[in-house]
């Protein structure tokens, strides 16, 4: 992204040193975060490669003032397991080097949770900082810089006086890029807060530019004696991102940068709160509901993202940066709930319990706050929603809440959980949390074990992403860097595995379970895996009506051949503590042979290790004459046993998705997909029992 017209005006070069008479206040801040309960080795790697060497280096320069925000759980993890790193933080805090900045303890998107929870999370982190670091925050880090004016009241209610956003927030709202060298003030309902605009130019420069160019970038922000160069960005850029550890520490970038800043008489490092106390605001600002520009791109559906990219290219960098930035933009962060129904489901399940939290015990309330962690709800250049372990964590917290509410007697309810206008049938036994969709064929959309806190229905749909075009139509992209610099992860220069194309398959319906397919042909393995079978029924992704008296989902649908043949489908469920059964009735006026298939999709932590009737799924398998199948999972020490009253053909494969991450493109095993099929003519009755057993 070309940022020449963003704040600080332009990236400097060695021939443009800035005005030597003007000084600038450097407001330098870093934010560190790991998804709540992330893999231990991932957290340890972040600490070893990034957090530990950063604070160890900064300890040598206590006169360098800077701001730090950390999600609360990560800070406590460091305090508990890496006391030396925490000691460096405490030392720098006592020396007046660090200003601690607040936010939600578990790093929620504040505008995506209610005020009660937002204030509870903000206050929880503030109390932690006061108790353990003797620091009371005055400012807030805005998670993923997702701005809605509704957050002002919550921040002010918690005693916070300022928040950092991107300069893009201002530019997209019509502000001049040359006036981003201080703070503005905004309000909501008369509650006022200060807004500091983070310089995109500095965000893309540090630590990727060499030391000299980095200092020159800061000096470019010097317009008058009150000017501030504002940078607040991911600490992970300083050691954890690809190639940065060697660059920042082994090659000495950080040490050289800090020394160069301290030696430069034109630059004064200052805390945000100090600048707020000693300088006037630049005026009043009302900002769009937005995040950083890239987030707006990512939240669009794939065809819209490609159209936005093409439009930017047609406008050209110069016009876009000068005038187009206020007019051309992507979607809002909450679009991720529209783009990914899997994200929306997690979010709305959380919101349902938040709304009814008066009935939650302390442990369940803490699980609710953990469930509000943002990482799993979106996807961009990082894995996010595509990472199964993040979704597993989210469902663990959700099932902790459900477990606290479960009784010996099975409880049922009918409510629109995901707020899509269609009600879901919710079943809570003493052992299982189950939800069935009326919008999608009476299908199973949650299958959670209250004992293991694991959701076997934590599945993902294969969908087209804008970045898949880089795999389908690769282009040679040369990295545009100077000597003594490194690339950002936003560079398009990435090595592509040519076999990734093989897994670029796209589904036309959500990957739930008990999905009803009808075809004129026997289902082949290749057609099932490739989603290329000839579907002639309208039951796989269409609404059913729920009959509360018979506990059954029904649809008056059709089989579509030379004409529509009226076809009726009824699905009646019954429940026990650890099992449930489905009695299927299918009646069609089409009298000739058709093929019925029932699709299951089950998520496992390690799909490659699961045994299906004693053998691994591997590259896929097919079995004939199946009346019973058992999926043994060593991770949960449970087995899913499916019994049928008729012999079926079985096809099974491990479903992979191709997603983008900070290290390139990744093939991720999401779930095991199964299809049990058999022929029928006019009428079919099929009884299926699902049981959870110990291994």
Whereabouts are the PLM-identified features?
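Active-site and substrate-binding clefts of carbohydrate-active enzymes
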Residues: 22-52, 59-61, 180-183, 189-193, ...
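Short, well-structured secondary-structure segments
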Residues: 24-114, 120-121, 138-142, 161-167, ...
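Acidic-aromatic substrate-binding/catalytic surfaces of carbohydrate-active enzymes
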Residues: 44-48, 116, 120-123, 433-547, ...
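Gly/Pro-rich turn-and-neighbor structural signature
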Residues: 116, 131, 135-136, 141-185, ...
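CE4/NodB-like, metal-dependent polysaccharide N-deacetylase domain
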Residues: 117-143, 220-235
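Beta-strand-rich recognition/accessory modules
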Residues: 409, 414-416, 531-570, 574-583, ...
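Acidic (Asp/Glu-rich), glycine- and aromatic
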Residues: 441, 446-452, 459-465, 470-474, ...
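A contiguous, surface-exposed recognition patch within enzymatic or periplasmic domains that forms
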Residues: 465, 469-529, 614-685
């Amino acid at each position: 992204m070309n940022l020449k017209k963003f704040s600080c005006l332009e990236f400097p070069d060695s021939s443009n040193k800035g005005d030597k008479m003007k000084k600038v206040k450097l407001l330098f801040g870093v934010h560190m975060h790991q998804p709540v309960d992330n893999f231990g080795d991932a957290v340890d790697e972040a600490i070893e490669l990034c957090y530990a060497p950063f604070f160890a280096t900064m300890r040598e320069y206590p006169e360098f003032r800077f701001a730090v925000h950390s999600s609360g759980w990560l800070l406590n993890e460091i305090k508990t397991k890496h006391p030396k790193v925490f000691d460096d933080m405490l030392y720098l805090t006592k020396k007046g080097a660090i200003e601690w900045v607040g936010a939600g303890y578990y790093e929620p998107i504040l505008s995506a949770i209610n005020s009660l929870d937002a204030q509870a999370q903000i206050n929880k982190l503030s109390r932690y900082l006061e108790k353990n670091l003797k620091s009371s925050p005055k400012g807030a880090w805005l998670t993923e810089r997702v701005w809605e004016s509704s957050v002002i009241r919550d921040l002010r209610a918690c005693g916070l006086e300022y928040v950092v956003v991107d300069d893009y927030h201002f530019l997209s709202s019509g502000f001049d890029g040359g006036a981003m060298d201080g703070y503005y003030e905004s309000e909501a309902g008369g509650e006022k807060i200060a807004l500091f605009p983070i310089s995109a130019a500095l965000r893309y420069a540090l630590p990727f530019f060499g030391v000299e160019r980095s200092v020159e970038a800061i000096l470019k922000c010097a317009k008058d004696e009150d000017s501030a160069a504002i940078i607040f960005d991911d600490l992970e850029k300083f050691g954890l991102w690809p190639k940065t550890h060697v660059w920042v520490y082994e090659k000495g970038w950080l040490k050289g940068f800090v020394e160069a800043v301290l030696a430069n008489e034109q630059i004064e490092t200052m805390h945000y709160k100090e600048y707020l106390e000693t300088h006037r605001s630049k005026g009043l600002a009302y900002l769009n509901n937005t995040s950083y520009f890239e987030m707006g791109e990512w939240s669009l559906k794939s065809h819209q993202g490609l159209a936005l990219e093409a439009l930017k290219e047609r406008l050209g960098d110069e016009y876009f940066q000068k005038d187009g930035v206020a007019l051309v933009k992507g979607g809002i962060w909450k679009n991720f709930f529209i783009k990914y129904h899997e994200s929306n489901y997690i979010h709305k399940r959380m919101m349902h319990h938040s709304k009814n939290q008066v009935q939650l015990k302390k442990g369940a309330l803490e699980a609710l706050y953990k469930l509000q962690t943002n990482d799993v709800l979106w996807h961009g250049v990082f894995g996010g929603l595509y990472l199964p372990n993040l979704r597993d964590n989210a469902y663990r917290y959700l099932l902790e809440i459900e477990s606290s509410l479960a009784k010996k007697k099975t409880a049922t309810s009918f409510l629109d959980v995901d707020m899509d206008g269609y009600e879901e049938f919710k079943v809570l036994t003493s052992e299982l949390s189950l939800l069935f969709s009326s919008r999608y064929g009476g299908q199973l959309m949650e299958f959670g074990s209250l004992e293991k806190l694991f959701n076997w229905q934590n599945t993902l749909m294969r969908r087209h992403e804008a970045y898949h075009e880089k795999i389908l139509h690769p282009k040679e992209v040369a990295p545009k860097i100077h000597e003594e610099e490194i690339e950002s992860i936003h560079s398009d220069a990435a090595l592509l595995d040519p076999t990734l194309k093989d897994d670029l398959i796209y589904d036309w319906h959500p990957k739930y379970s008990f999905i009803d397919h009808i075809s004129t042909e026997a289902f082949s393995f290749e057609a099932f895996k490739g989603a290329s079978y000839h579907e002639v029924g309208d039951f796989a992704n269409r609404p059913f009506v729920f009959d509360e008296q018979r506990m059954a989902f029904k649809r008056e649908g059709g089989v579509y051949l030379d004409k529509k043949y009226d076809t009726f489908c009824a699905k009646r469920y019954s429940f026990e503590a650890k099992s449930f059964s489905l009695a299927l009735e299918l009646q069609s006026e089409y009298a000739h042979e058709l093929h019925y298939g029932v699709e299951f999709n089950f998520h496992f932590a390690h799909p490659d290790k699961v045994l299906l009737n004693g053998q691994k799924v591997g590259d896929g398998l097919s079995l004939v004459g199946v009346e019973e199948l058992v999926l043994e999972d060593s991770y949960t020490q449970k087995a899913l046993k499916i019994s049928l009253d008729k012999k079926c053909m079985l096809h099974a494969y491990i479903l992979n998705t191709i997603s983008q991450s900070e290290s390139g493109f990744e093939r991720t095993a999401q779930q095991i997909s199964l299809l049990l099929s058999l022929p029928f003519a006019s009428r079919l009755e099929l009884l299926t029992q699902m049981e959870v057993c110990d291994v």
